């Protein structure tokens, strides 16, 4: 009689602990079924499609709402609660991990696309083009990345990023001086045939979107400053700790709505797709990308985790299942960040000092899936154009894809912009990016899931490598709790200083027998 009761109890406990994950899986299945049925048996107008996706739009807006307070509070508290030397070591380990896994992903993608050759059997004119090619200068994009790391207005950085564009200037006109504060101009001259020149001015403007890099740099510096043993700084640390905890409670409320939002997100996207024929034409290319993402997430990342941490990587990945499903559905590492925090801290029990410091940085610069996708896409486009890439060009693609994926968060429309940068680096036609835009929305979801998984494994690996420093901080913290004050020696009134000595700080007096008593005043 006892065993069945225990099994029933375990089953109920499993449902209670995983109801959100199970309901999300059910929502995904229902979303696919509803999307296919509505697409097959009902012809919705564009306006009706827009209304149909409204519940999913609400989910996206709620998740994006908590990104800013979560990044700011978690970064500041994560850095402030760590010693400056410890935070430096943790940051270095995280960056080395990010760089190595991204480079491995790029190499894997190139090996697969060169072996499978998805573009050899097709021609450029056989694939329909979709969308427009963004005009991107590699130099300008890199400079914008650095500019966005140092925003001139912190409030503006919360909702806008800096971006430069080039405008052609008529040769007959002298370059004027524009005193408008909103634009920054520079004259650039490019030589063309017949000794003629084209003149450009680089115009600075702002585009919508959180300047994540700028906020992270500011929060990093602020966390280091207030994290020092400074009485007034502790007030700010407590404030941001409270803000972080409050934000996570809001995230818990949002996650209760998540299954409904995901259902309408996936169904709405299926209804919106107009031409499914493009998936057949680009089937081999998509299979190459998805194979690379699968190998990286199922073999490489778990293997690295197992070698370093010596724990079951698949159990760790199961703990991140809710975050991975969310990333798959909403296609945004930053918007998934609240769920990633919750899974890492509550399901996998990763130290909060690690997650708060590592995850915001990882969501910004660790883009394994994106780097793999860009490498595959660049070689695929070269194969479509019957171009044989040299070893030097392949190395260039590897380096550029790695660097571009790391800096993707610092530029608007990161997917297209970084893809154009990679193509331009090896002399491939940038306009051919329009050949793969039609399937990008689907591949983006899978590569975002790989990005989030890489961030999660990173927290576990960095925690293991930083175990000694964290234990030393715990011991130091316990010592401070036992004796939290710096005691100053003094003699109490009406007492013989040779026979009895007290140690006074603030409003406490401690004698040699370690008996604590309140004094009437803190001034002696």
From Swiss-Prot:
GO terms for cellular component: apical plasma membrane; cell periphery; early endosome membrane; late endosome membrane; neuron projection; plasma membrane; recycling endosome membrane; synapse. Residues 1-18, 83-93, 230-238, 309-313, 345-353, 463-524 are cytoplasmic. Residues 314-344, 394-427 dip into the membrane without crossing it. Keywords: Amino-acid transport, Cell membrane, Chloride, Endosome, Glycoprotein, Membrane, Metal-binding, Phosphoprotein, Potassium, Sodium, Symport, Synapse, Synaptosome, Transmembrane, Transmembrane helix, Transport. InterPro entries: DAACS, Na-dicarboxylate_symporter, Na-dicarboxylate_symporter_CS, Na:dicarbo_symporter_sf. Glycans are attached at residues 178, 195. The keyword rRNA-binding does not apply. The chain crosses the membrane at residues 19-38, 62-82, 94-114, 206-229, 239-266, 287-308, 354-380, 441-462. This is Excitatory amino acid transporter 3. It is a multi-pass membrane protein. Homotrimer. Interacts with ARL6IP5. Interacts with RTN2 (via N-terminus); the interaction promotes cell surface expression of SLC1A1. Interacts with SORCS2; this interaction is important for normal expression at the cell membrane. Its main location: membrane. Sodium-dependent, high-affinity amino acid transporter that mediates the uptake of L-glutamate and also L-aspartate and D-aspartate. Can also transport L-cysteine. Functions as a symporter that transports one amino acid molecule together with two or three Na(+) ions and one proton, in parallel with the counter-transport of one K(+) ion. Mediates Cl(-) flux that is not coupled to amino acid transport; this avoids the accumulation of negative charges due to aspartate and Na(+) symport. Plays an important role in L-glutamate and L-aspartate reabsorption in renal tubuli. The modification Phosphoserine is found at residues 517, 522. It catalyses: K(+)(in) + L-glutamate(out) + 3 Na(+)(out) + H(+)(out) = K(+)(out) + L-glutamate(in) + 3 Na(+)(in) + H(+)(in); K(+)(in) + L-aspartate(out) + 3 Na(+)(out) + H(+)(out) = K(+)(out) + L-aspartate(in) + 3 Na(+)(in) + H(+)(in); D-aspartate(out) + K(+)(in) + 3 Na(+)(out) + H(+)(out) = D-aspartate(in) + K(+)(out) + 3 Na(+)(in) + H(+)(in); K(+)(in) + L-cysteine(out) + 3 Na(+)(out) + H(+)(out) = K(+)(out) + L-cysteine(in) + 3 Na(+)(in) + H(+)(in). Pfam families: SDF (PF00375). GO terms for molecular function: chloride transmembrane transporter activity; cysteine transmembrane transporter activity; glutamate:sodium symporter activity; high-affinity L-glutamate transmembrane transporter activity; L-glutamate transmembrane transporter activity; metal ion binding. It comes from Bos taurus. Belongs to the dicarboxylate/amino acid:cation symporter (DAACS) (TC 2.A.23) family. SLC1A1 subfamily. GO terms for biological process: chloride transmembrane transport; cysteine transport; L-aspartate import across plasma membrane; L-aspartate transmembrane transport; L-glutamate import across plasma membrane; L-glutamate transmembrane transport; transepithelial transport; transport across blood-brain barrier. L-aspartate binds at residues 331, 333, 370, 411, 447-448, 451. Na(+) 2 binds at residues 364, 405-406, 408. Contains eight transmembrane regions plus two helical hairpins that dip into the membrane. These helical hairpin structures play an important role in the transport process. The first enters the membrane from the cytoplasmic side, the second one from the extracellular side. During the transport cycle, the regions involved in amino acid transport, and especially the helical hairpins, move vertically by about 15-18 Angstroms, alternating between exposure to the aqueous phase and reinsertion in the lipid bilayer. In contrast, the regions involved in trimerization do not move.
């Amino acid at each position: 009689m006892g065993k069945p009761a225990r099994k029933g109890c375990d089953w109920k406990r499993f449902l209670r602990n995983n109801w959100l994950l199970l309901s999300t899986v059910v929502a995904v299945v229902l979303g696919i079924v509803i999307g296919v049925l509505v697409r097959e048996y009902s012809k919705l107008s564009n306006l009706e499609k827009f209304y149909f996706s409204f519940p999913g739009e609400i989910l996206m807006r709620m998740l994006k709402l908590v990104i800013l307070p979560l990044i700011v509070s978690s970064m500041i508290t994560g850095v402030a609660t760590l010693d400056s030397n410890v935070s430096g070591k943790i940051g270095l380990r995280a960056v080395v991990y990010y760089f190595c896994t991204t480079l491995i992903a790029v190499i894997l993608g190139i090996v697969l696309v060169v072996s499978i050759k998805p573009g050899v059997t097709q021609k450029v004119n056989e694939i329909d083009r979709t969308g427009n090619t963004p005009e991107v200068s590699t130099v300008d994009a890199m400079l914008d990345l650095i500019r966005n790391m140092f925003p001139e207005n912190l409030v503006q950085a919360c909702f806008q990023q800096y971006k430069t564009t080039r405008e052609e200037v008529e040769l007959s006109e002298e370059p004027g001086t524009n005193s408008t504060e909103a634009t920054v101009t520079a004259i650039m001259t490019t030589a063309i045939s017949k000794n003629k020149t084209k003149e450009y001015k680089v115009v600075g403007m702002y585009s919508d979107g959180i300047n994540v890099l700028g906020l992270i740099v500011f929060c990093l510096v602020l966390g280091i400053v207030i994290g020092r043993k400074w009485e007034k700084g502790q007030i700010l640390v407590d404030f941001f700790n409270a803000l972080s905890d409050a934000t996570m409670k809001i995230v818990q409320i949002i996650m209760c709505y998540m299954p409904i939002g995901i259902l309408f997100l996936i169904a709405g996207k299926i209804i919106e797709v107009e031409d499914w024929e493009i998936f057949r034409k680009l089937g081999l290319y998509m299979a190459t990308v998805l194979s690379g993402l699968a190998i990286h997430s199922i073999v490489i990342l778990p293997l690295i985790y197992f070698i370093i941490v010596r724990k079951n990587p698949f159990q760790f990945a199961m703990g991140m299942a809710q975050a991975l499903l969310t990333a798959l559905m909403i296609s945004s590492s930053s918007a998934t960040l609240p769920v990633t925090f919750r899974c890492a801290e509550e399901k996998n029990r990763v130290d909060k000092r690690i997650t708060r410091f590592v995850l915001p940085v990882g969501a910004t610069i660790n883009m394994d899936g994106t780097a793999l996708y860009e490498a595959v896409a660049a070689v695929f486009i070269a194969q479509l154009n019957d171009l044989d890439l040299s070893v030097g060009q392949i190395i260039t693609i590897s380096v550029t894809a790695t660097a571009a994926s790391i800096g993707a968060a610092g530029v608007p429309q990161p997917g297209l912009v970084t893809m154009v940068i990679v193509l331009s680096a090896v002399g491939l036609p940038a306009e051919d990016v329009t050949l793969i835009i039609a399937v990008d929305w689907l591949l983006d979801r899978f590569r975002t899931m790989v990005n989030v998984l890489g961030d999660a494994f990173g927290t576990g690996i960095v925690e293991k490598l930083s175990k000694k420093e964290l234990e030393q901080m715990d011991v130091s913290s316990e010592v401070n709790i036992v004796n939290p004050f710096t005691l100053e020696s003094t003699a109490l009134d009406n007492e013989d200083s040779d026979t009895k000595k007290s140690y006074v700080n603030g409003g406490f007096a401690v004698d040699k027998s370690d008996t604590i008593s309140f004094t009437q005043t803190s001034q002696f």
